[in-house]
Amino acid sequence: IEGDLERILENGMLPERMADADMGRADRNAAKALLAKVYATHYKSGDAKYARAAQLCKEVLESAAVGNPQTGADLVAYNKIFDITNEMNKEIIFAARYLSGNVGLGSPFGNMFAPVNNGANVIIGTSSGYNTPSDNIITAYTMRGATDKRLDVNIAQKYFNSTTQEWVTTGNCRYCKKYTNPVSTQYDGESDWPIIRVGDIALLYAELTNEISGPSA
């Protein structure tokens, strides 16, 4: 995979950002980000390819095709990253794309993550209750204080029962909600699945830089 990705970059085989019609296909920044992850995983500080990983991260973060984590330019609020009206925003470097509308390209994750036996109050169709948020993950969010918006974006801790007209707050009521959106058919969600994000590469770059040259002000 190292040779394949380096060859793609050396020969300029991918554009810096795909045209709208091809959005979702891997572009040059996706290739750089993936190669950086490979080098960061397989090598260590002192290896040339470890330093290469840091350089690749830097190039991605400086690209006009993605949001700038230093200035905030072209980035969006966390709750908008996963919004189906804002897909492939500049926080997203690479994602698995889905399309609802009964065309065979819908996302299954809304149904997979919804609470079992929720009576279609969370989503239409079969619900599997996978990836149920634990007490530990809830605590990890709340320990960061009320300003951490990710908890409410990522996790629902209750749902409304339209039959009883009451909130379900006990038992199997928690679920990962950021991939849940209204569907008319089960397993036919619209939400894309981000695979590589700007925040991901910014954190990787910080880790690599710290390992290579130590912390800086």
Each predicted region: which residue ranges?
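Short coil/turn linking the two alpha-helices of tandem helical-hairpin repeats
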Residues: 38-47, 211-214
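Tetratricopeptide repeat
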Residues: 1, 5-8, 53, 60
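Flexible helix-coil transition and linker loops at the boundaries of alpha-helical arrays
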Residues: 13-24
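Elongated scaffold/linker segments in the mid-to-C-terminal portions of large proteins
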Residues: 23, 55, 59-62, 66-213
